[in-house]
Amino acid sequence: MKSAMTSSPLRVAIIGAGQVADKVHASYYCTRNDLELVAVCDSRLSQAQALAEKYGNASVWDDPQAMLLAVKPDVVSVCSPNRFHYEHTLMALEAGCHVMCEKPPAMTPEQAREMCDTARKLGKVLAYDFHHRFALDTQQLREQVTNGVLGEIYVTTARALRRCGVPGWGVFTNKELQGGGPLIDIGIHMLDAAMYVLGFPAVKSVNAHSFQKIGTQKSCGQFGEWDPATYSVEDSLFGTIEFHNGGILWLETSFALNIREQSIMNVSFCGDKAGATLFPAHIYTDNNGELMTLMQREIADDNRHLRSMEAFINHVQGKPVMIADAEQGYIIQQLVAALYQSAETGTRVEL
């Protein structure tokens, strides 16, 4: 699955030259002497040119297939709009590249399954940038859960909520290109973090409700302006995931919701021995009525993007490190699809 260490730098290409390609992928790659950013591709050639110039002398392309054939990179970051993750990831894998793909993995579970199977068949690393699981908080809490400190966890609550945060840039309000709204954009992050800490328990069923009450009525928020006439994603979604072990995960996510807080991105866990919150990581319990804190981080770790990218490259180089792998990406894609299906049909979805 992994390439051997070599003396020459790994050649890296980026498909999709938007904000995340700049702030996360290119900025990280250019900090390492064992990596060389050799190509940037975007259908908007001027966008690719700007990113390439910012980080050196990478060649610029508007056709990913032509770029892959000509440049022959070792590693590709897929940062294109969600609709193209499947196409661009398969293209890169079949060109012999290891791939770091932005979330979500794809638009459907079937696509995510094919991406996973293709990577396995070709012996290439496919990872997804579910970076919240790489926070020190998440890593420490996962260790404590594995060691049984919380006991049997029977209720988990994952919240990715914005009060007035519809993105006014990109394609975030376009369901055809994005696949959905807050669930597939920010809710998916807390869903992955929760599932990771829980150890990816087997899912029995999913039940959800979604709402579109604000985005089609307003046109401006704290994250910019949008056109309410073309707003086609949900404002908010609420769902319950039931596990075969008897536990449940309650998920809340929104771009726009009339709550007091401007933003909430957190997960809480209730076990029969102790409870915990994730950001920052706290574990708490009681001893015959005496409230006790068993673990407490004062400030949540902010280097999670860096740790995610670092883990991917180290894994490609053959180091035994954890990544958000293709199989887990498929499971998360299944859950997202089931939540949307349940919300759209008004019925429980069995998995």
Swiss-Prot record:
It catalyses: a D-glucoside + NAD(+) = a 3-dehydro-D-glucoside + NADH + H(+). Catalyzes the NADH-dependent reduction of the oxo group at C3 of 3-dehydro-D-glucosides leading to D-glucosides. Probably functions in a metabolic pathway that transforms D-gulosides to D-glucosides. Can use 3-dehydro-D-glucose, methyl alpha-3-dehydro-D-glucoside and methyl beta-3-dehydro-D-glucoside as substrates in vitro. However, the actual specific physiological substrates for this metabolic pathway are unknown. To a lesser extent, is also able to catalyze the reverse reactions, i.e. It is an enzyme of class 1 (oxidoreductase). Its EC number is 1.1.1.-. Belongs to the Gfo/Idh/MocA family. Keywords: Carbohydrate metabolism, NAD, Oxidoreductase. The lineage of its organism: Bacteria, Pseudomonadati, Pseudomonadota, Gammaproteobacteria, Enterobacterales. SUPFAM superfamilies: Glyceraldehyde-3-phosphate dehydrogenase-like, C-terminal domain, NAD(P)-binding Rossmann-fold domains. This is D-glucoside 3-dehydrogenase. InterPro entries: Gfo/Idh/MocA-like_OxRdtase_C (IPR004104), Gfo/Idh/MocA-like_OxRdtase_N (IPR000683), Gfo/Idh/MocA_Oxidoreductase (IPR052515), NAD(P)-bd_dom_sf (IPR036291). Gene3D superfamilies: Dihydrodipicolinate Reductase, domain 2 (3.30.360.10), NAD(P)-binding Rossmann-like Domain (3.40.50.720). GO terms for molecular function: nucleotide binding; oxidoreductase activity, acting on the CH-OH group of donors, NAD or NADP as acceptor. It comes from the Bacteria.
